[in-house]
Amino acid sequence: MNDPRKGADAEPTTHFGYQNVPESQKAKKVAEVFHSVAAKYDLMNDLMSGGIHRLWKRFTIELSGVRSGNRVLDIAGGTGDLTRQFSRLVGPTGEVVLADINASMLKVGRDKLLDKGVSGNVSFVQADAEKLPFPDNHFDCVTIAFGLRNVTHKDEAIRSMLRVLKPGGRLLVLEFSKPSSNLLSKAYDAYSFSLLPLMGKLVTNDSESYRYLAESIRMHPDQETLKAMMVEAGFDRVTYHNMTGGIVALHRGIKP
């Protein structure tokens, strides 16, 4: 006979790619992925996207509305592509915080930006998006690029981002999404599940991390679902822009 207490006490599960894992294990598994790929992260981004990721990020910067004197939080900032541009925009009177939960990615980002002479108005913080260690109503703009799909409790992370934004502040979520046509979706799946792991094997000697990447993209909420999550969290005027046929979407919301 089954013991009902065993089911009641069982740890909740979540997805890690296509696997179901205990929630407490997902963060550890995601950390292992990014520890593995950190050193070749920029190179793989260029190879995987053909450099198009730079255009996606440029549009994010343009839509952010960031200007001189602003305070910006770049969550899952990784190797610092957005942080570098925000540092230039906010100037000496502004501030940019690059936050990442992964120590290896944070080190790569810090070293890269310091090598490029980006300092003074940039700080680096190891932080969990679900429990941001910043005061309420603190930032003019919060961004998270290609990071939300790796978060265990996305709704908690979105609420945390809302909390640290000033009234009128903007959240921008740049993330892989659902292609707008079935033909493109099939072609993208074939690319993601066949070529990405092969490239990962050749460049980083790690095919499994890039298999997880492909699976995590497919498990991420689609455009309308993510929009609804942002509205539910309390954001106003939530919109999204599809790029490259919906392979990537940029969501934007305003804190009331």
UniProtKB/Swiss-Prot annotation:
Write down the SUPFAM superfamilies for this protein, in alphabetical order. S-adenosyl-L-methionine-dependent methyltransferases (SSF53335)
Catalytically driven reaction(s): a 2-demethylmenaquinol + S-adenosyl-L-methionine = a menaquinol + S-adenosyl-L-homocysteine + H(+); a 2-methoxy-6-(all-trans-polyprenyl)benzene-1,4-diol + S-adenosyl-L-methionine = a 5-methoxy-2-methyl-3-(all-trans-polyprenyl)benzene-1,4-diol + S-adenosyl-L-homocysteine + H(+)
BP terms from Gene Ontology: aerobic respiration; menaquinone biosynthetic process; methylation; ubiquinone biosynthetic process
Instruction: Check the UniProt entry and state the signal peptide residues, or none.
Output: none
Short name of any one Pfam family annotated for the protein: Ubie_methyltran
Assigned keywords, A-Z: Menaquinone biosynthesis, Methyltransferase, S-adenosyl-L-methionine, Transferase, Ubiquinone biosynthesis
Annotated positions binding S-adenosyl-L-methionine: T79, D100, D128, A129
Which InterPro entries did the record assign?
A: SAM-dependent_MTases_sf, UbiE/COQ5_MeTrFase, UbiE/COQ5_MeTrFase_CS
Classify the source by domain of life: Bacteria
Annotated pathway, please?
Answer: Quinol/quinone metabolism; menaquinone biosynthesis; menaquinol from 1,4-dihydroxy-2-naphthoate: step 2/2; Cofactor biosynthesis; ubiquinone biosynthesis
EC number(s) for this protein?
2.1.1.163, 2.1.1.201
Q: Give an example GO molecular function.
A: 2-methoxy-6-polyprenyl-1,4-benzoquinol methyltransferase activity
Q: What does this protein do?
A: Methyltransferase required for the conversion of demethylmenaquinol (DMKH2) to menaquinol (MKH2) and the conversion of 2-polyprenyl-6-methoxy-1,4-benzoquinol (DDMQH2) to 2-polyprenyl-3-methyl-6-methoxy-1,4-benzoquinol (DMQH2).
The UniProt entry's sequence similarity note says: Belongs to the class I-like SAM-binding methyltransferase superfamily. MenG/UbiE family.
The family database entries (NCBIfam families) matched by this protein are listed as: MenG_MenH_UbiE, PRK00216.1-1, PRK00216.1-5
Listed name of the protein: Ubiquinone/menaquinone biosynthesis C-methyltransferase UbiE
Organism listed in the record: Pseudomonas aeruginosa (strain ATCC 15692 / DSM 22644 / CIP 104116 / JCM 14847 / LMG 12228 / 1C / PRS 101 / PAO1)
Organism classification: Bacteria, Pseudomonadati, Pseudomonadota, Gammaproteobacteria, Pseudomonadales
Gene field: ubiE
